[in-house]
Structure formats: structure tokens, C-alpha cells
């Protein structure tokens, strides 16, 4: 393990391992946190990518063996690339990777739309919602306070997106692709589904809105076009929005009932539901 902000350590790790494939998912991945810690965001999301790319190019020149890189980018760039420190850092990293590709590195960029699973960090709004619904269902709290509920996003299952990433790296040529479901949902839809999955019915009686929680410069709509990935990879997301939210709520209920926050049983693929894709 290495701190990607440590350029010497990261460079030494690459030289020691001499990888055939690198999947760079390291990031300050919270837009909200990027406003609070913009310097950290640049160091991890942009500068570390510059160091990694330089190390991989040096390895390739030294060994004469191709190395392939997948760089995880973000749907936030598809909105306003200057809207947040996070978006700016990811846009800059994309340029670093494309430049390296022009100089012979087999580097692909995947613009990942929101990808969820029961392992989502507690600081993210999706987990705040599923955890809150679970806590209310178990009588551990009475209300959930949220910000803006009418933003529209493309929520998918992380496991589906990992398959797309694998296919991108295995492709004959480096690719730049959006990775998402193409199915829009409001944040309110996620709230309603989570409360229904927790057995509470309508969410409205339990939810308050606080304007102070609205993020600055939040893009109203971010939804992927899944067609490029389907054409290039034969890939399309197979897990529905409802299945993902249901799985997250089920695991949060299990966490609260057992006191076990992390378990390999939480890694299971969401169960198929009878709900249509939507």
C-alpha cells in the first residue's frame, strides 16, 4: 500500500512491481469534500496521476513491454467541468492520460456515473438516505434531513461498472467512454425507494429539507449515454436502480441489527426484483 501523494513511493512501487495493467481508482471522490479540501483534491486526483503516468511510461521504455492503464474519471465533467474542485481535478487528469496515450501509453479513461453498492461510504448522500431509512425503521431515529431532492442522476451498480472497466482494459485499442445506465432518477426517487425498502411506505412524513445542505454549483442533471459502451464493449448495465437501493437498505438494516459494520456477506450482488427497469 502506498499514499499516492508520495511521488517517490508511488514511482518506486511501479518500478518494483512492473505491472501489466493498472486500474487507478484512487481519488478524493466526494464533490462536497473537494470544496473543503481543494489542495488535497488536486494532489490525489491530478498530481498523483501525473506521477503514475510518468512512472508507467518509464517502465514501458525500460522493459519494452506494453502496460495498460485505466483511469477512473467522473460524470461530473459531463456537466460543468469547472463547477467544483473535484470536477476540475478530474478534467485535468483526463488531459494527462490523453497526452500519455499520444506518447504510446495504452491508457483508457472511463467517465463513471454514480456507482453504488452496500459498501458506499457513510458520508455520501445515498448511504445517508439508506442508513437513515434503516434507522427510522428500527426506531433509532425519527427524521432524516436532506438538501435538494430534485437533482437528476444516473445511479448504477458498482459491480456492473467493474465489468465495463475490465472490458475497456482488454480492448484492442485504448478507449474513452462514459459508463452509466442511461436511466435518470431524481434524488427523491432514491429516497422514496429506500423508505419503501425499509418497510416504511411513503418517505414524506419522515423527511425534512434544509437549504443549507445544498451544494454550491450542483449540476441539475447528469445522465449517461450508454450507447458508446454498448457499441465498443457489448456492455450494458444489468442491475436496476430498485435492486441497488433495496440491497443497500437491506445491508444497512443488517448492520444495525447485528452491530457488524463490515462483512463479506455484504458483497453479494443485489437480488433480482420484479420491478421493470426505470
Regions from the PLM with identified roles:
Residues 5, 36, 44-47, 84, ...:
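Residue-level signal for the nucleotide or nucleotide-sugar donor/cofactor binding architecture
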Residues 240-278:
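Amphipathic terminal alpha-helices
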Residues 85-87, 91, 95-154, 158-169, ...:
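NAD(P)-dependent short-chain dehydrogenase/reductase
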Residues 1-115, 239, 266, 272, ...:
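N-terminal Rossmann-like NAD(P)+-binding domain of SDR-like oxidoreductases, especially those catalyzing
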Residues 139-145, 165-179, 203-205, 256-263:
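Core catalytic loop region at the nicotinamide-binding pocket of NAD(P)H-dependent oxidoreductases
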Residues 158, 189, 209-236, 254-255:
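Conserved C-terminal active-site "lid" loop/helix of NAD(P)H-dependent oxidoreductases
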Residues 161, 165, 179, 190, ...:
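Non-catalytic, hydrophobic alpha-helical segments
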Residues 129, 136, 170-216, 226:
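Mid/C-terminal beta-alpha module of Rossmann-like enzyme folds, strongest
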Amino acid at each position: 500500500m502506498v499514499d499516492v501523494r508520495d511521488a517517490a513511493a508511488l514511482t518506486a512501487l511501479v518500478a518494483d512491481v512492473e505491472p501489466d495493467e493498472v486500474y487507478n481508482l484512487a481519488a478524493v471522490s466526494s464533490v462536497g469534500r473537494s470544496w473543503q479540501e481543494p489542495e488535497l483534491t488536486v494532489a490525489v486526483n491530478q498530481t498523483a496521476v501525473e506521477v503514475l503516468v510518468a512512472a508507467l511510461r518509464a517502465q514501458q521504455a525500460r522493459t519494452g513491454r506494453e502496460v495498460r492503464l485505466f483511469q477512473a474519471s467522473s460524470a461530473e465533467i459531463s456537466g460543468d467541468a469547472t463547477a467544483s474542485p473535484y470536477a476540475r481535478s478530474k478534467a485535468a487528469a483526463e488531459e494527462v492520460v490523453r497526452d500519455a496515450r499520444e506518447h504510446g501509453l495504452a491508457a483508457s479513461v472511463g467517465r463513471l456515473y454514480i456507482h453504488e453498492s452496500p459498501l458506499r461510504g457513510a458520508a455520501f448522500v445515498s448511504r445517508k438516505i439508506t442508513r437513515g431509512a434503516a434507522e427510522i425503521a428500527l426506531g433509532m431515529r425519527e427524521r432524516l434531513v436532506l438538501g435538494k431532492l430534485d437533482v437528476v442522476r444516473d445511479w448504477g451498480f458498482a459491480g456492473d461498472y467493474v465489468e465495463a472497466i475490465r472490458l475497456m482494459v482488454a480492448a484492442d485499442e485504448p478507449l474513452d467512454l462514459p459508463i452509466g445506465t442511461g436511466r435518470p432518477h431524481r434524488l427523491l426517487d432514491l429516497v422514496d425507494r429506500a423508505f419503501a425498502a425499509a418497510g416504511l411506505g411513503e418517505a414524506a412524513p419522515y423527511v425534512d429539507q434544509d437549504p443549507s445542505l445544498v451544494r454550491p454549483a450542483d449540476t441539475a442533471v447528469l445522465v449517461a449515454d450508454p450507447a458508446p459502451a454498448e457499441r465498443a464493449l457489448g456492455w450494458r448495465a444489468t442491475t436496476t436502480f430498485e435492486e441497488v437501493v433495496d440491497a443497500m437498505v437491506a445491508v444497512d438494516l443488517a448492520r444495525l441489527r447485528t452491530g457488524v459494520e463490515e462483512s463479506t456477506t455484504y458483497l453479494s450482488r443485489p437480488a433480482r426484483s420484479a420491478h421493470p427497469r426505470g
